[in-house]
């Protein structure tokens, strides 16, 4: 069940961050419903400090608090800008409720990419991945290079500091080149 999996994830984050934050030479102990750790030397430590924990999801209650407590980055993948904005606001409120500066968190999203030189190119790429152009325009990064740049600027205005782009047709290298040459230099 989802609730139980979320409980397990919460404990996993408590354990891993507890291990990472235990000073060298000290031991870490944890006793929870799903995990018990006794006298762990809490080694090795991660190279990055703080470790880049990414918490993602669209759950309106528990996810924002989990992100506020543990994440370096919050990600809501494959949603529209409005849903992204609403969820980020919940995360900011959760940060404030536990005394964390909401600006200490990075906010990101993930989108499916479908960029083409013209409408026919876009439609061909959407069909190749079994998706509808209109759905991709709503929830993805879809359109001409100019439209993609505008869409990324809208995401940025909504608070996205980082975007993860997903190419579903891994054989279409021209698609990757198009994004790299005509979109990315301008955002």
Feature-to-residue mapping (PLM):
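Active-site-adjacent structural elements that line small-molecule/cofactor binding pockets in enzymes
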Residues: 1-187
């Amino acid at each position: 069940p989802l609730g139980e999996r979320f409980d397990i994830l919460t404990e996993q984050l408590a354990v891993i961050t507890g291990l990472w934050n235990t000073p060298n030479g000290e031991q870490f102990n944890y006793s929870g419903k799903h995990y018990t750790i006794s006298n762990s030397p809490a080694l090795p430590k991660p190279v990055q400090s703080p470790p880049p924990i990414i918490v993602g999801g669209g759950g309106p209650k528990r996810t924002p608090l989990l992100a506020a407590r543990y994440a370096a980055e919050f990600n809501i993948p494959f949603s529209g800008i409005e849903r992204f904005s609403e969820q980020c606001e919940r995360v900011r409120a959760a940060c404030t409720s536990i005394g964390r500066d909401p600006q200490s968190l990075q906010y990101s999203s993930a989108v499916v990419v479908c960029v083409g030189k013209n409408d026919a190119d876009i439609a061909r790429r959407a069909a190749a991945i079994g998706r509808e152009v209109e759905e991709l325009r709503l929830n993805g990064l879809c359109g001409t290079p100019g439209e993609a740049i505008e869409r990324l600027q809208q995401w940025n205005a909504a608070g996205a500091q980082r975007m993860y782009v997903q190419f579903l047709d891994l054989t279409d290298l021209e698609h990757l080149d198009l994004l790299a040459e005509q979109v990315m230099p301008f955002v």
